[in-house]
């Protein structure tokens, strides 16, 4: 039901959607974002990961936040099947997937670190996590222990950097395989700079109208 409401919101005649910022660039506040920029963001991610029509995308994030909304928009933009499960700490449990009537292999999923950590602890859920073709992890830091575990995963696993104002992520860090890295790489359409005191400045015109000065320090 939640994803259907999000789709209706996306398809109504208004050019904008109301979201609330996370506080990365200041005090949390309501923010009107353009639907076209949401589609731009979705296309950037889908193109980068090589997602295609008919892929299966797991929606296990609350739709109150940009991460959940953007999973729906990515599904719309790319023509993916959305597997909608109730947001919980165990999105790959038998109970969660049974409620979604899903037996399909999951192509693409976005999770927070806690969901990944919990899934790693349960053998059946760990097996399902291993089978996800493209997994992005955001909304919190990936600690060294988790990064070491994910490095051995056979498929593509990424940690994301972004915020509500950038309509989810603008940079990715590869966690799995021989290309695993300690550094985040911005998308080609994104430019970064620093302020005099070392804070990150983001210029991502396809997804954000103005340049953003964050509270994050650049190393």
Where are the regions a protein language model picked out?
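Conserved AMP-binding A3 loop
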Residues: 15-43, 50
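Conserved ATP-binding loop and adjacent catalytic segment of the adenylate-forming AMP-binding
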Residues: 155-197, 204-210
């Amino acid at each position: 039901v939640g994803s259907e409401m999000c789709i209706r919101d996306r398809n109504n005649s208004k050019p904008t959607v109301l979201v609330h910022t996370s506080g990365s660039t200041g005090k949390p506040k309501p923010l009107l974002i353009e639907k076209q920029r949401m589609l731009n963001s979705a296309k950037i991610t889908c193109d980068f990961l090589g997602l295609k029509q008919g892929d299966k995308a797991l929606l296990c994030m609350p739709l109150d936040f940009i991460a959940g909304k953007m999973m729906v928009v990515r599904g719309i933009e790319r023509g993916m099947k959305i597997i909608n499960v109730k947001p919980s700490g165990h999105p790959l449990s038998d109970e969660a997937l049974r409620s979604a009537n899903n037996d399909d292999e999951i192509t693409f999923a976005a999770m927070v670190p806690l969901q990944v950590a919990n899934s790693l602890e349960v053998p059946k859920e760990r097996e399902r996590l291993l089978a996800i073709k493209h997994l992005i992890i955001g909304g919190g830091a990936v600690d060294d222990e988790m990064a070491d575990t994910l490095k051995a995963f056979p498929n593509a696993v990424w940690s994301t950097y972004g915020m509500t104002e950038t309509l989810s992520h603008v940079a990715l860090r590869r966690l799995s395989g021989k290309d695993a890295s300690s550094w985040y790489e911005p998308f080609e359409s994104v430019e970064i700079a620093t302020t005099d005191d070392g804070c990150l400045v983001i210029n991502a015109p396809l997804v954000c109208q103005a340049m953003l000065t964050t509270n994050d320090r650049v190393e």
